[in-house]
Every structure is written in structure tokens, then in C-alpha cells.
From Swiss-Prot:
Role this protein plays: Catalyzes the interconversion of methylthioribose-1-phosphate (MTR-1-P) into methylthioribulose-1-phosphate (MTRu-1-P).
GO terms, molecular function: S-methyl-5-thioribose-1-phosphate isomerase activity
The EC number(s) this enzyme carries: 5.3.1.23
Reaction(s) the record says it catalyses: 5-(methylsulfanyl)-alpha-D-ribose 1-phosphate = 5-(methylsulfanyl)-D-ribulose 1-phosphate
Regions annotated as coiled coil: none
KW Methyltransferase (keyword) present: no
Keywords from the named record: Amino-acid biosynthesis, Isomerase, Methionine biosynthesis
Residues at the catalytic site: D242
Protein name, entry field: Methylthioribose-1-phosphate isomerase
Organism: Methylococcus capsulatus (strain ATCC 33009 / NCIMB 11132 / Bath)
Pathway participation: Amino-acid biosynthesis; L-methionine biosynthesis via salvage pathway; L-methionine from S-methyl-5-thio-alpha-D-ribose 1-phosphate: step 1/6
Site (Transition state stabilizer): C162
Length: 352
């Protein structure tokens, strides 16, 4: 699929491959500035992931796949006989960029499998493998959009958290893809988006994406979610996932667990939307998921950063929502309602 085909689906693209390297839309600058930066090394792509220039579990995996291509290109040019050894080092660097998003490790393993069979110049075959990962994610997004829209039906309002659209994926979106598909069916009146502190992905990215598609949206403070639910304005909370355990527990952006608890109290349903690659079948429950914690300086006012300050900050960027609080998990392989070890095992059978 060409970049033109990707743009036909989404008004924005987080990632674009060019002969010079990987073009990354710097999401830290949105919505004020739309700036693409070109990265031509695997280490550069790893830094782009770690610094959150690119973010969202599927997009992280796609970026890492292209990072392997860049690493292989440089390694083969330096030493055609031993390039694979150097690329393994690049894969290790990419794997350390973000610990929670399982799509990262899934994509790197796909690229490692493609690399194993290559003799000679690795770039054509590895670039084809990276493009397949990118294209497959877009196809999965479109499929999930239709499956999720069929569940939402004639929904008056939905609440979403963080950013799960084209900026976070190969195009179109996971949770935001469901919202897009529901809107295009004429079956949704309004989207509510949390600001999603501390990086404000909802305030900066989600409402910007919705505005690009002319979908009516209302931004609210994270702390206003309970009051919104009590008002009856929303019937569903629709979110993405960075990792789903084999029992249906879900790791997602910090605040998702709070929304799940609030939704259950107010009779609002919770839908999780993620590609099947986000399910980590080797992780039994959410208790086994490593939750990333970022620099406290992302939260603290400069006044409290001095060496003599007694003020600290705790900055986990994900939390884990128990399967018991989730009404539906939507993947391109099928939908699981009321997820449990048994229903997730059935999904695994479909995905094979």
C-alpha cells in the first residue's frame, strides 16, 4: 500500500517511509505545529519512540520495524558479512525504548523472523516486511472500526481517553477508528475526550484528529469524567490498549482504570479496541505487566526541582484495568464480551 493509500484513509499520518529514512510526525508539537522529522538510524528511531515523538502501541511497533530496516541498511554497508550481528544490537536498543507496549516486541520479532532467511542485501526484504506490518495494522484498524461500530449502534455519546487514532496507529485508529466508523454510519451524536494528563494527548491530539474529520467533540478535564457519566451524556467509554493479558486484563494509558471503575458505578459500558498483536498470550494476568514510569520532571513545577526540595512525583504512564470491568474487547480477529480466560482462549483460536 502506498503512502497515497494511507492518506486516503486518514487526514494525518504519524509515519511515512522515504528513501532517506523514516519521517516521523513530532506529536509533541501538535496541534500548534505539524513538523515531520527524518530519522535515518535505528538509534534515532528508538529515541523518537522514547521521547514520545511517536506514541501509541501500534505506531510504536511500526516505527520500530522501520528502525530495523535502517539499522540493516547501515550495518550491511559497513560489513556485508556480519550485518545480522549489528542489527541484533539495534533490535535490543529499540526494545528498550518503551517497556509496556507489547506491539513493539511483536513487531521486532516479526522483523527478526524476516531477517533470518535473508542472504545478501537485506534492505528490500526487510522494507517489504516493515511495510506489511504497517499495511496489516491499517487493515486491522478498518476491520475493528466496523466490528465496534456494530456494537455501539445508535449511541448518543461516547467518552474516549488518550489518543487512539491515526496518530497512534498505521492509520484510522483503534478506539478512535470505532468512533469514526460509528459516526460515518450516522449512529453517534457526540464524542467526549478527556484531556489525558500529563501529556494531554486528548487535549492536543484526539480533539485535533476529530476536528480534521469534522466530528463533533467536547473536551473535558480528566476529573470531570464522573460528573459527565452521571449526566447521562455517554453510554460507552471506548479506549485502546498497550497490552492485553491472556485473561483479558488491559494495560492502557494512566486513568483508564479510574474510568472503568466510574463507568461500572454509573452503568456506562467499557469497550477496549486493539489489534490482536496487542494481546500478550505469554502474560497470564495484568499483575505480570511491567508498567512504565516516566521522569517525575514531567509533572513537577520547576520550583520543586532543586536539590533541596522535599517534593517528589510519581509518574506511572499506564495502569491495568481488570477484565471484570470490561464489557467488550474488539480485535480484527473478533469480539470478546465479558472477557475471561475462557473467552480469551476462544479468541486466540480464531486468531491462529
Amino acid at each position: 500500500m502506498s503512502d497515497h493509500s494511507f492518506s486516503a484513509v486518514s487526514a494525518v499520518q504519524a509515519l511515512k517511509w522515504s528513501d532517506g529514512g523514516l519521517e516521523v510526525l513530532d506529536q509533541r508539537l501538535l496541534p500548534g505545529d505539524v513538523v515531520y522529522q527524518i530519522f535515518d538510524t535505528a538509534a534515532g528511531v528508538a529515541e523518537a519512540i522514547a521521547s514520545m515523538r511517536v506514541r501509541g502501541a501500534p505506531a510504536i511497533g511500526i516505527a520500530a520495524a522501520y528502525g530495523v530496516v535502517l539499522g540493516a541498511r547501515a550495518a550491511y554497508a559497513r560489513d556485508p558479512a556480519h550485518w545480522k550481528r549489528a542489527v541484533e544490537d539495534d533490535i535490543a536498543v529499540l526494545a528498550r525504548s518503551r517497556p509496556t507496549a507489547v506491539n513493539l516486541f511483536w513487531a521486532l520479532e516479526r522483523m527478526r523472523e524476516a531477517m533470518a532467511a535473508i542472504e545478501g542485501d537485506p534492505v528490500p526484504a526487510l522494507l517489504a516486511a516493515a511495510r506489511r506490518i504497517h499495511e496489516d495494522d491499517l487493515a486491522a484498524n478498518l476491520a475493528m472500526g466496523e466490528l465496534g461500530a456494530a456494537i455501539l449502534g445508535g449511541c448518543k455519546g461516547v467518552l474516549t481517553h488518550c489518543n487512539t487514532g491515526a496518530l497512534a496507529t498505521g492509520g484510522y485508529g483503534t478506539a478512535l477508528g470505532v468512533i469514526r466508523s460509528t459516526w460515518r454510519r450516522g449512529a453517534l451524536e457526540r464524542v467526549y475526550a478527556t484531556e489525558t494528563r500529563p501529556w494531554s494527548q486528548g487535549a492536543r491530539l484526539t480533539v485535533w484528529e476529530l476536528g480534521q474529520d469534522r466530528i463533533p467533540a467536547t473536551l473535558l478535564a480528566d476529573s470531570a469524567a464522573a460528573w459527565l457519566m452521571k449526566s447521562g451524556a455517554v453510554q460507552w467509554v471506548v479506549v485502546g490498549a498497550d497490552r492485553i493479558a491472556a485473561n483479558g486484563d488491559v494495560a492502557n494509558k494512566i486513568g483508564t482504570y479510574s474510568l472503568a471503575v466510574l463507568a461500572r458505578h454509573h452503568g456506562v459500558k467499557l469497550m477496549v479496541v486493539a489489534p490482536i498483536s496487542t494481546v500478550d498470550w505469554a502474560t497470564a494476568t495484568g499483575e505480570d505487566i511491567v508498567v512504565e514510569e516516566r521522569d517525575p520532571r514531567e509533572l513537577l513545577h520547576p520550583l520543586f526541582l532543586g536539590s533541596d526540595s522535599v517534593i517528589g512525583a510519581w509518574n506511572p504512564v499506564f495502569d491495568v484495568t481488570p477484565a471484570a470491568l470490561i464489557d467488550a474487547i474488539v480485535t480484527e480477529a473478533g469480539v470478546v464480551t465479558n472477557p475471561s480466560p475462557d473467552t480469551m482462549a476462544t479468541l486466540r483460536g480464531k486468531a491462529r
